[in-house]
Amino acid sequence: MIEILGIGAATLALFVGFGLLIGILFGFFGMGGSFLVTPALLVMGYPSRVAVGSGLAFVFGTSVIATLKHRDLGQVDYKLGVLMIAGTTLGIEVGKRIVFFLETLGLAGSIISVTYVVLLGGIGLFVTYEAIQGDDGGGVDHEAEADAEVDAEEIPDIAKKIQSYRVPPMISLRGGISVSLWMILGVAFATGLLSGFLGVGGGFIRMPALFYLIGVPVPIAVGTDLFEIVFSGGIGSFLYAMDGGVDLSIVAPLLAGSALGARFGSAATSIVDESEIKVYFGLMLLGGSVAVAIRELGSYFEMPVLDTVSLVLILGSALLVSGMVVYSSLVELRRGSGQQSVTPE
């Protein structure tokens, strides 16, 4: 069998293709990287610390690519991003220590998998419900909202409630938002803890938290989330690499595929209404939750076929949602060109 980077050619092609799909999701949603990569590596039989550490290293590389594109679109709040980094750093170290402690007890793999099932399932249900109910207030003009002041009617009720608690010091953010520093640091620590424990960038929790809890406009929430993930992913992957938890034969082909996908996904935020895709993203989270649960059942009952089913679910969910992003982008581009062609001279 031909081997490249120490892995088989088929596995290499799988990683490159998977990286492409995840890059699209990462650039478009500001999330969608390691919360799919880490479970996939666990399903493929990699040790917990390698799955977590390699997931973080992948997140770091992909977030750099996507952040550069969002910076060009003016969708990064640097003040908010720097404050998030402060709380995230401590959370990552705490999460890493928990993983290493659980490994000494032989419980890391099972507990990480169960946590994934609960988090992905819960957030997936919430996002899907919000999308079906249409509570996001309609379409999102990604370019227009980057610098415009936020309309109070577009801020989620829970974010309005949180903003009403004026616990000093208060921080002014883009879009005319003012929120307590302690809320920002609290969200950052919680997502940092998840980054270190689960090997995720925290984006699948941080981006919704920035929007639903703090009231940051969706485009800025995505761009700022990615900016923060550059640092959380970098710090996390460095800490794991120091303890032999990063496998470059995994990370390199994933990054090769994601480089193109992340640029495309980031560009798509300026032309595609996220509400059109949100329900599919919620279903993808639910698919990931079911996939990890099936893997655990396969391990418990010693049924390898369930591991295969789990991997197919993870890859299939990524393919479905990234495909919808590409399809919606093409539809919007065609619609825009059609409108230009009928505009009178």
Regions found by a protein language model. Give the residues of each.
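Serine/threonine-rich low-complexity intrinsically disordered regions
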Residues: 8, 141, 151, 156, ...
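Flexible cytoplasmic inter-helical loops of multi-pass small-molecule transporters
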Residues: 133-162
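A contiguous, mid-protein "functional segment" used to position or interact
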Residues: 267-313
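Small-residue-rich hydrophobic segments that form or flank transmembrane alpha-helices
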Residues: 2-104, 110-115, 119-121, 125-132, ...
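Transmembrane alpha-helices
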Residues: 115-122, 299-345
